[in-house]
Amino acid sequence: MKTLIRPLVVIFVVLTAVTGLAYPAVMTVFGQAVFPSQANGSLIEKDGRAVGSALIGQPFDAPKYFWGRLSATSPMPYNASGSGGSNLGPLNPSLAEQVKARIAALRDAGTDMSTPVPVDLVTASASGLDPEITPAAAAYQVERVAKARNLSADAVAQLVAANTAGRQFGVLGEPRVNVLKLNLALDAAQAAH
């Protein structure tokens, strides 16, 4: 029996040391050396204070701000510990009701309804935490935001363009706008205005 237990204990201790101590330590040092911003959560700072992460969406509901994708984490929106989609299928009547309610909320906020609503403004993402919207979703909100801030639509559209990231390496993903970064740029532009 002793001959069976000793190798098991040795393997347990060695694997615990490798996977529980050595590997995490090496990856932490590597991450801090090569990707310090990402390793620390891709935090966005304003006046030396962290105001959010570039990787996790935040709720914005005031008309003077661009709104991001809806969060599927309830009851607390954009709760990273509750990440997950709504799991409503495309034929589910509840999804259609939710989309209609979201379109009505956009209309009530004074958004121009003469053009089709971009899908990312009325549906949640798979994670429920998306920090980004499509350029079309940002363009759809330009008039409302400009009116609420007493800025020209052209000035707001220029901020959208300046905060639009292209495809990674020119081929991966789609162009996107980080809502938090755009809203911070809007605040800065209005303060300077």
From Swiss-Prot:
Gene Ontology cellular component annotations, sorted alphabetically: plasma membrane
Top-rank taxon, per record: Bacteria
Localization per Swiss-Prot or TrEMBL: Cell inner membrane
Parts of the chain that traverse the membrane: 7-27
Entry keywords, A to Z: ATP-binding, Cell inner membrane, Cell membrane, Ion transport, Membrane, Nucleotide-binding, Potassium, Potassium transport, Transmembrane, Transmembrane helix, Transport
GO MF: ATP binding; P-type potassium transmembrane transporter activity
Principal location class: membrane
Topological type in the membrane: Single-pass membrane protein
InterPro entries per the UniProt record, alphabetical: KdpC
Similarity comment text for this entry: Belongs to the KdpC family.
Subunit structure: The system is composed of three essential subunits: KdpA, KdpB and KdpC.
Role, per record: Part of the high-affinity ATP-driven potassium transport (or Kdp) system, which catalyzes the hydrolysis of ATP coupled with the electrogenic transport of potassium into the cytoplasm. This subunit acts as a catalytic chaperone that increases the ATP-binding affinity of the ATP-hydrolyzing subunit KdpB by the formation of a transient KdpB/KdpC/ATP ternary complex.
Name assigned to this protein: Potassium-transporting ATPase KdpC subunit
Species annotation: Burkholderia ambifaria (strain ATCC BAA-244 / DSM 16087 / CCUG 44356 / LMG 19182 / AMMD)
Gene designation per UniProt: kdpC
